[in-house]
C-alpha cells in the first residue's frame, strides 16, 4: 500500500482561517502604529504582489522613505512567520489526530514496526538501531531567542483554535491574548544587536531539550519498545534515538571554540539533564503515597527507605516516598559534584547506579500490585536515564586537517624528531607517524619547548575531553572529526595528538577518529584513504575497541559548492557504496555521518526520502546526521513536531535496512552508467561557470546580499575561514544563503538541466529510460523531487532585479546564462516526472508557497532598494540593519536559510 505524507492529509481550510485571523490582527496592529498613508502603501504592495505586477511593485518600493521602510519591512517579515506557526500547529494537530484514529501515514512508527516484525532478524535490527540527530550552531539560525519564545506563545494559542470554534474556550480572551503577543512581536527587535557567543549558542540549544527533546525522545523510545513487544519482540537495551552536539566542540573555522567552551557545553548539558531527573523524581515523590499498611514493598526499597533522610513521622509507612527522597538527594549531590567539583553528600558514581535504584522501585511495584504506576512518566524516566546518562548528548570535536598537521609538525620539531615534517611525501609522513604511534611511548609535548598558541589550544581541548569523559561518562565525547580529510596522514596526525593526552594508545581508542570527506576529489579518493587505514593493525585495534564500528562523515555542502548539485549527490552516493563494500571486505561496520544542511544545496530536503534513497546496505544499524541551526526550530520547536520528525528518522532508517527493492538489485548497472555520463557533463557545466568564468566572482558578490549576510549577527562563527578573494574561500553556508536570498537557488539545480537535455537529445528513447529511473529508483526520485522543490521556490524575475545590481555589462550578462539553464532544468524535470507544473506531487507545499509567496516577494524588492541606497551611501548605520530584517523575513518565508 502506498502511504501519503502526513502533511498532504492536513485540513488546509483551518490553516487558511488561522492565517486570515493572524493577518487581520497584524494589519490592525500595524495600522494603529503608522500614518494612514504609510499603512495604505502596505495594502497597495500586497495587491501589486498578488497580481504579480512587479514593475508597479518596484516603483512603489522605490518611492518609500527610509522611515517607511522600517515598519513595512517588519510587517512583511512577521507575516510569513505567523503563517509558519499556523502550519506547524496544523501539522501537530494532524499527528495527534492520525494517531488517535489509528490511521497509517508515511513513516508512522507502528506501521514500520509491524513491517520489520515479519523479518527473521527483527530483534537484532530493532535492538541495535541507533539514529543520532546532531545539533549544530551553523550561522543560519536567524531568529532571536526572544522571538522564538514569543512564537511559542502564539503556537500554544493557535493549538486552542479548534476548541475556540467549538465554544469550549472563551473566544474574546483567546483573541485578545493572540493580539497581545502579535503586538509584542511587532515591537520587538527581530535581529540581534551583537553577534552570538558560543555560550549563547549552547544555552539556545538547551532550550530545545527543555521544550521538546526531553519529552519526545523518551516517549518515542517507550513507544518503540511497546510496539515491538506487541509483536512478541522483547527489546532490552534498544536506543533508537540518541542525541549529538557540535556546539562547544566544533572549532573548524571558529576561533571562539576552546577548551573552556567544550567544558561549558558538557557541564551545561549535565545541568539540564540533572535538573530534569530532579524534577521527575520529585513528581514521583508527590505521586507515590503508597502505604505499607495496604501494600508491601521489596527488601531493597525498604533498605533505600532506611537510608533516607526523610524522617517525617507522616511518612513512616510511605516507603516509596522515603526511597525516592533518598534517590533525589543523591541526584542533587551528584549534580553538585559534577558541575561544581564539590562533595556534599552521598552521590551516584555513574548513571547506571541511578538506573539501578529506579529499577528497584519498578521491580517492587511489579511485585506488589503496582503495575499501572510504572506506565507513563516512570517508564519514560527509565528510558531517559538509559539514553541521556549524566551527559545528555555526545559532543563531537571537529577541526580542520591543516590545523592538525601544523600541530604535529611543531611537536615533531620540538622533540627533535623531524624539523620539516610538512615537506615530507605522504608515504614518508605515514611511516614516521606510525613509528611514533606503534613504537614510541613517550609524550612529545612533555618537552620544555614553548608551545605555539595553536598547539597549546588544541592540546588543551583534548585534555579537557579526557577529563570530561572520566567525569561524566565515556559517551560524553565519542567522535573527533577531521574536516577536509584527504589522506591517511590526516587521520594519523589526529591520532598523534590524541596519544599526547591518553585518548589513544597501542591497544584502544577512547574516541573514534572520523574523517570528513568534503570535496568531489576527496570523496572520489575516500575509498583509497580508508583502505589504507583499515589495513593498519593499529587501526584495527582502535576500531575493535569501538565495538567494530568505523564512522565516516560525508560533506554535502562543500561537495555541492565544488561540483554542483548533481555531481555532489552522485559522488556521495558512489562513495557510500564503495566505503560500505570496503568495510565488508575488512569485516568492519562502516557507518555514515551525513553532514546535511537545511537547504537542498547543502544536502537538505525531506528527511524520510533522503534516508530511504541511500545506497543498498549503506545503513547498517547506525546513522548520524546534522540538524543545522536554521531547521532545528522548524523540526523540533515543540514536542509534537519533535516526535514526528524523530519518528520519520527512525522509520526511514528501518525501512531502508529491511527493504530490498527490485530496483536496488537489478537497476544499478544500467542506471549508474547513465548517471556517470550525465554527472560528468553536469560537473563540467557547473565548473565552467563558477570557476571558469572570470566574471562570476564579481557577479555573485554584486548581485547578492553576501556582504550583509557576512555582517549578520546570526552565529559565533565567521562567514569564511579566511579573507574572501575567491569563491573557493567562501564557506558553503553563506554561499547557499546568498543564493536563497536573491531567489536564484543556484546551488540546488544549476547544471542539472543541460546535462539531462544533452542525454535526451542523443536518443529519443532516453527520455523513457529517465522516466523509468524516476519511477523505480528511490535515489533518482529523491534527487529530482528536491530539484523540483528548489525551482518552485526560485523566482527569476526577482533574480533579474538582483542582477541589475551589477554595474559591468559583462558581469550582468551571467544572469542570462543562469536563466537559460533554469528554464532548461524546469522543462527537463517536468518532462521526466510527467507533470505539467512543479510540486504536482506535493500539494501541501504548493498551497503553502502559493499563499506566502506574494508576501515575501515584497521583501525582495525592499531588500533590493535598501542595497541600492546603501551603495549610494543613503542609509545610516541603524537603517542598514533594515537589510538584515529583510534577510530574516525572506529566510522565514522560504523556511530555510543556509
From Swiss-Prot:
Listed SUPFAM superfamilies: Phosphoenolpyruvate/pyruvate domain
EC number: 4.1.1.31
Keywords (A to Z) from UniProt: Carbon dioxide fixation, Lyase, Magnesium
Pfam families assigned to the protein according to its UniProt record, in alphabetical order: PEPcase
Stretches that traverse the bilayer: none
GO molecular function terms listed in the Swiss-Prot or TrEMBL record: magnesium ion binding; phosphoenolpyruvate carboxylase activity
UniProt cross-references to InterPro entries, sorted A to Z: PEP_COase, PEP_COase_bac/pln-type, PEP_COase_Lys_AS, PEPCASE_His_AS, Pyrv/PenolPyrv_kinase-like_dom
One GO CC term, this protein: cytosol
Function: Forms oxaloacetate, a four-carbon dicarboxylic acid source for the tricarboxylic acid cycle.
HAMAP family in the cross-refs: PEPcase_type1
Protein family: Belongs to the PEPCase type 1 family.
Protein's name in the database: Phosphoenolpyruvate carboxylase
Gene giving rise to this polypeptide: ppc
Amino acid at each position: 500500500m502506498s502511504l501519503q505524507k502526513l502533511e498532504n492529509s492536513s485540513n488546509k481550510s483551518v490553516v487558511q482561517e488561522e492565517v486570515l485571523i493572524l493577518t487581520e490582527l497584524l494589519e490592525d496592529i500595524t495600522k494603529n502604529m503608522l500614518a494612514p498613508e504609510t499603512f495604505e502603501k502596505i495594502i497597495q504592495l500586497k495587491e501589486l504582489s498578488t497580481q504579480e505586477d512587479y514593475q508597479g511593485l518596484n516603483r512603489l518600493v522605490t518611492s518609500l522613505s527610509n522611515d517607511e521602510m522600517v515598519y513595512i519591512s517588519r510587517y512583511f517579515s512577521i507575516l510569513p512567520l505567523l503563517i509558519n506557526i499556523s502550519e506547524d500547529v496544523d501539522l501537530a494537530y494532524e499527528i495527534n489526530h492520525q494517531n488517535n484514529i489509528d490511521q497509517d501515514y508515511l513513516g508512522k512508527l507502528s506501521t514500520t514496526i509491524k513491517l520489520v516484525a515479519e523479518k527473521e532478524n527483527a530483534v537484532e535490527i530493532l535492538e541495535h538501531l541507533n539514529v543520532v540527530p546532531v545539533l549544530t550552531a551553523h550561522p543560519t539560525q536567524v531568529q532571536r531567542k526572544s522571538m522564538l519564545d514569543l512564537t511559542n506563545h502564539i503556537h500554544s494559542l493557535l493549538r486552542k483554535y479548534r476548541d475556540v470554534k467549538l465554544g469550549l474556550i472563551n473566544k474574546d480572551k483567546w483573541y485578545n491574548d493572540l493580539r497581545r503577543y502579535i503586538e509584542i512581536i511587532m515591537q520587538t527587535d527581530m535581529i540581534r544587536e551583537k553577534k552570538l557567543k558560543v555560550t549563547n549558542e549552547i544555552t539556545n540549544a538547551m532550550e530545545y531539550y527543555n521544550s521538546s527533546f526531553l519529552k519526545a525522545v523518551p516517549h518515542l523510545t517507550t513507544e518503540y519498545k511497546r510496539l515491538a513487544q506487541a509483536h512478541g519482540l522483547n527489546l532490552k537495551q534498544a536506543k533508537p534515538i540518541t542525541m549529538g552536539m557540535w556546539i562547544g566542540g566544533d572549532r573548524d573555522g571558529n576561533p571562539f571554540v576552546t577548551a573552556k567552551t567544550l567544558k561549558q557545553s558538557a557541564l551545561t548539558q549535565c545541568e539540564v539533564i540533572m535538573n530534569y531527573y530532579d524534577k521527575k523524581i520529585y513528581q514521583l515523590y508527590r505521586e507515590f503515597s503508597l502505604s505499607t499498611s495496604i501494600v508491601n514493598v521489596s527488601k531493597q526499597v525498604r533498605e533505600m527507605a532506611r537510608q533516607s533522610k526523610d524522617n517525617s513521622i507522616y511518612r513512616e509507612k510511605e516507603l516509596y516516598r522515603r526511597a525516592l527522597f533518598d534517590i533525589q538527594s543523591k541526584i542533587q549531590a551528584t549534580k553538585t559534584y559534577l558541575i561544581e567539583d564539590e562533595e556534599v553528600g552521598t552521590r551516584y558514581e555513574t548513571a547506571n547506579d541511578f538506573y539501578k535504584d529506579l529499577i528497584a522501585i519498578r521491580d517492587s511495584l511489579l511485585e506488589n500490585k503496582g503495575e499501572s504506576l510504572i506506565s507513563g512518566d516512570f517508564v519514560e524516566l527509565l528510558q531517559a536515564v538509559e539514553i541521556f546518562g549524566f551527559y545528555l548528548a555526545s559532543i563531537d570535536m571537529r577541526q580542520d586537517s591543516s590545523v592538525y598537521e601544523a600541530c604535529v609538525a611543531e611537536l615533531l620539531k620540538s622533540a627533535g624528531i623531524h624539523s620539516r615534517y610538512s615537506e615530507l611525501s605522504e608515504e614518508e609522513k605515514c611511516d614516521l607517524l606510525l613509528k611514533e604511534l606503534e613504537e614510541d611511548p613517550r609524550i612529545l609535548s612533555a618537552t620544555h619547548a614553548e608551545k605555539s598558541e595553536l598547539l597549546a589550544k588544541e592540546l588543551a581541548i583534548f585534555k579537557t575531553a579526557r577529563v570530561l569523559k572520566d567525569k561524566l561518562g565515556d559517551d560524553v565525547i565519542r567522535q573527533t572529526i577531521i574536516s577536509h580529510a584527504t589522506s591517511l596522514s590526516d587521520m594519523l596526525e589526529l591520532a598523534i595528538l590524541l596519544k599526547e593526552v591518553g585518548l589513544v594508545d597501542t591497544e584502544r581508542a577512547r574516541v573514534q577518529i572520523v574523517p570528513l570527506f568534503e570535496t568531489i576529489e576527496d570523496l572520489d579518493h575516500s575509498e583509497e584513504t580508508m583502505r589504507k587505514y583499515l589495513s593498519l593493525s593499529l587501526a584495527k585495534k582502535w576500531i575493535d575497541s569501538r565495538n567494530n564500528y568505523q564512522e565516516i562523515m560525508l560533506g554535502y555542502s562543500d561537495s555541492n559548492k565544488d561540483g554542483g548539485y548533481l555531481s555532489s549527490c552522485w559522488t556521495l552516493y558512489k562513495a557510500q557504496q564503495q566505503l560500505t563494500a570496503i568495510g565488508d571486505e575488512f569485516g568492519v561496520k562502516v557507518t555514515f555521518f551525513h553532514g546535511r544542511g537545511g537547504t537542498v544545496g547543502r544536502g537538505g530536503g525531506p528527511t524520510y526520502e533522503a534516508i530511504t534513497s541511500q545506497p543498498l546496505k549503506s545503513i547498517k544499524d547506525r546513522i548520524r546526521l546534522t540538524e543545522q541551526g536554521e531547521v532545528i526550530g522548524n523540526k523540533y520547536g515543540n514536542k509534537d513536531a519533535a516526535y514526528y520528525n524523530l519518528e520519520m528518522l527512525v522509520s526511514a532508517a528501518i525501512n531502508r535496512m529491511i527493504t530490498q527493492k527490485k530496483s536496488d538489485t537489478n537497476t544499478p548497472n544500467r542506471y549508474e552508467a547513465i548517471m556517470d555520463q550525465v554527472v560528468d557533463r553536469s560537473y563540467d557545466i557547473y565548473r565552467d561557470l563558477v570557476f571558469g568564468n572570470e566574471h562570476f566572482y564579481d557577479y555573485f558578490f554584486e548581485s547578492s546580499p553576501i556582504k550583509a549576510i557576512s555582517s549578520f549577527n546570526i552565529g559565533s562563527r565567521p562567514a569564511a575561514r579566511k579573507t574572501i578573494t575567491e569563491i573557493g574561500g567562501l564557506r558553503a553556508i553563506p554561499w547557499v544563503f546568498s543564493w536563497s536570498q536573491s531567489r536564484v537557488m543556484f546551488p540546488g539545480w544549476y547544471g542539472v538541466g543541460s546535462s539531462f537535455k544533452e542525454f535526451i537529445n542523443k536518443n529519443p528513447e532516453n527520455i523513457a529510460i529517465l522516466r523509468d529511473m524516476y519511477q523505480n529508483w528511490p535515489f533518482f526520485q529523491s534527487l529530482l523531487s528536491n530539484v523540483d522543490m528548489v525551482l518552485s521556490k526560485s523566482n527569476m524575475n526577482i533574480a533579474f532585479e538582483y542582477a541589475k545590481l551589477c554595474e559591468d555589462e559583462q558581469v550582468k550578462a551571467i544572469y542570462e546564462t543562469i536563466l537559460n539553464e533554469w528554464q532548461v532544468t524546469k522543462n527537463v524535470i517536468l518532462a521526466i516526472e510527467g507533470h505539467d507544473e512543479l510540486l504536482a506531487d506535493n500539494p501541501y507545499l504548493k498551497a503553502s508557497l502559493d499563499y506566502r509567496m506574494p508576501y515575501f516577494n515584497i521583501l525582495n524588492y525592499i531588500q533590493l532598494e535598501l542595497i541600492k541606497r546603501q551603495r549610494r551611501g543613503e542609509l545610516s548605520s541603524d537603517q542598514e540593519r533594515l537589510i538584515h530584517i529583510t534577510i530574516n523575513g525572506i529566510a522565514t518565508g522560504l523556511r530555510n536559510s543556509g
